[in-house]
Curated annotation (Swiss-Prot):
It is found in: Secreted. Belongs to the snaclec family. This is Snaclec purpureotin subunit alpha. Homodimer (non-covalently linked) of heterodimer of alpha and beta subunits (disulfide-linked). One of its GO terms (molecular function) is toxin activity. Its main location: secreted. Residues 9-128 form the C-type lectin domain. Keywords: Disulfide bond, Hemostasis impairing toxin, Platelet aggregation activating toxin, Secreted, Toxin. InterPro entries: C-type_lectin-like, C-type_lectin-like/link_sf, C-type_lectin/snaclec_domain, C-type_lectin_CS, CTDL_fold. SMART domains: CLECT. GO terms for biological process: venom-mediated platelet aggregation. It comes from Trimeresurus purpureomaculatus (Mangrove pit viper). Disulfide bonds join 2-13, 30-127, 102-119.
Length: 133
């Protein structure tokens, strides 16, 4: 079950936070909101559709992008894309060297495609956590 101000999909709970924060501050905010919460990870096509529909219903202006939990982490010589909640990135994503290391969903794409932007930008965001059974 999810708290009353959160939306549910399968066993997870989701909440849109309409505060402008950097990626790191948004991730920290999610962690502070609820035990086990992170910026949203999107692990399947069906979950992507759910997230896009939830955002479309609640975010009416194109001026907002929405942080998701995906970022490029530098590990020595290697760069890898990782979800902040530790879930696996389950598709091939070749990241060319790029200073834009954090990802948003944009209204223009109906919140369906992931775009990389600078992590220091401020955007609204969505938190996700595993609900209680």
């Amino acid at each position: 079950d999810c708290p009353s101000d959160w939306s549910s999909f399968k066993q997870y709970c989701y909440q849109i936070i309409k505060q402008l924060k950097t990626w790191e501050d948004a991730e920290r905010f999610c962690l502070d909101q609820m035990k086990g919460a992170h910026l949203v990870s999107i692990e399947s096509y069906r979950e992507a559709v759910f997230v896009a529909e939830l955002l479309s219903e609640n975010v009416k202006t194109t001026k907002y992008h929405v942080w998701i939990g995906l970022s490029v982490q530098n590990k020595g010589q290697q760069c890898s894309s990782e979800w902040s909640d530790g879930s696996t990135v389950s598709y091939e994503n070749l990241v060319k060297p790029n200073p834009k290391k954090c990802f948003v969903l944009k209204k223009e794409s109906e919140f369906r495609t992931w775009s990389n932007v600078y992590c220091e930008q401020k955007h609204i965001f969505m938190c996700k956590f595993l609900g209680s059974r």
